[in-house]
Structure formats: structure tokens, C-alpha cells
Design a protein with these regions (language model features):
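Extracellular modular ligand-binding repeats in secreted and cell-surface proteins
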Residues: 199-222
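Predominantly extracellular beta-rich ligand-binding scaffolds that present long acidic/polar faces
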Residues: 1-201
Length: 222
């Protein structure tokens, strides 16, 4: 889905040209997503695919979570654990998922924007990710695939992923250990548990719970 403005004319509600010029026309819009949790797989074939919202041109997203899911973008760009593309604010959210896409793939957002239609830019702050990116042609990161927009106090756990497009940034996108992640007082329970699932012919053969950093013995593989 998207958080944006529908520009199609509504003849019943839209202000028409008959309104006198002595009246000042002013519009206000509000759009908030709060405490939304997604545990289901998301698949798209075009640009703007996200665990919570695909394209976010406006509004405010906070305290959301994607957990134990796969987010795939077959042919398009801008794939994110929380938002595919944001031109607004993404704050205080958690992402634990597997992602794939063509360009601009990020654990929190695929990319932000420098300047939106109303002159403002995106802000991505105080988010945490523990993700795996299995396929990306260009521009990937545990937080974002692009450094466009404002990034503040975002943190990620990864042995191989950069924070934002091949780099980590102090104060913007910093790596932390899993032990440090566990010290967060508001850490969702889903960030503390892991399940290994074996699938054959689209059927689950075996599922096993394990701790972060555990190794799997060959005898455990069906």
C-alpha cells in the first residue's frame, strides 16, 4: 500500500473554480501508521515494496515491526523492511526479515528523499534492523540502500551488510552487537527468537528454534 495523496477530482467534495478569490484555500492532511506488526511474506513485481508500506510520500510511521518474513521485489527498485520509499518520517521501528530486489534495498527503507512535493524531506530515526539481503544488483544496506534524506540514530546487527549503501555512518547508521540489541528495554520479543525451517516441494518438513549465533549440525538436517 501507499501513504500519498489521491489527485483524482471528486466532483462532490473538491473545491471548484466557482469559489470566490476572497477566500483563502488551505488543505491539511494527516496520515499515521502506529504499532503495526507484519509477519507475512510480501511479494511485488514493480517498484516500491515494503513490509509495512510500499511508498510513503507523507505522514508519520512509528513503533512498527516486521518479523520472520520475506520481502521480495521481482523487477522493481525500492524495497524496504519497513518502507520501500519514504518521503516522510519512519521512527522507532524494528525489522527482522529477508529481502531481495533490483536496486535500493534496505533493512528499514529502500531509500529516503531529499525533497518531497511539499518541500520537506524524509527522516529515518531510531530504528533497528537484523536482516539478510539475498539479492540486490545495486545500492543495499542494513538500514537503507541510499543515503538520501536525513538519517539519525539507526542501528543494525550484521556480519556482512553495511549500514547505508556500502558504508556505516556514526550517528546515522551504526552497527551494534546482538548482545547490545538485547539490552533495549522496548525490544520486541520477535527480535529475540529464531526458527530454522526446512521446506521441500512447498511443504514444511521441519522447524527448529535456535539462538542467534548457533551452528547447525549436519545430523539436524532432514
Amino acid at each position: 500500500g501507499s501513504m500519498t495523496i489521491e489527485y483524482t477530482l471528486d466532483p462532490e467534495d473538491d473545491v471548484t473554480g466557482h469559489l470566490s478569490n476572497i477566500y483563502r484555500k488551505q488543505y491539511e492532511y494527516r496520515s499515521i501508521i502506529q504499532k503495526c506488526v507484519n509477519t507475512g511474506d510480501v511479494a511485488g513485481k514493480r517498484s516500491y515494496v515494503g513490509g509495512i508500506v510500499g511508498r510513503m510520500d507523507l505522514g508519520y510511521l512509528t513503533a512498527c515491526e516486521t518479523s520472520s518474513c520475506t520481502i521480495t521485489n521481482e523487477n522493481g527498485s525500492y524495497t524496504g523492511g519497513i518502507a520501500g520509499l519514504t518521503g516522510a518520517t519512519v521512527h522507532g521501528s524494528f525489522s527482522k526479515c529477508t529481502l531481495s530486489g533490483k536496486k535500493y534495498v534496505g533493512g528499514i527503507v529502500g531509500s529516503g528523499v531529499q525533497e518531497n512535493v511539499d518541500g520537506s524531506g524524509s527522516t529515518v530515526s531510531w530504528n533497528y534492523s537484523l536482516v539478510d539481503i539475498t539479492d540486490c544488483q545495486q545500492y543495499q544496506g542494513a538500514i537503507s540502500g541510499s543515503d538520501t534524506g536525513t538519517f539519525e540514530h539507526n542501528y543494525y546487527v550484521s556480519d556482512d551488510l553495511p549500514g547505508i549503501n556500502r558504508q556505516g555512518y556514526t550517528g546515522r547508521a551504526e552497527p551494534i552487537s546482538y548482545a547490545e540489541l538485547l539490552t533495549l528495554p522496548d525490544l520486541p520479543e520477535s527480535m529475540k527468537s529464531f526458527t530454522l525451517t526446512f521446506v521441500a516441494d512447498d511443504k514444511t518438513v521441519l522447524s527448529r528454534a535456535f539462538n542467534y549465533g548457533d551452528s547447525i549440525d549436519e545430523s539436524d538436517i532432514p
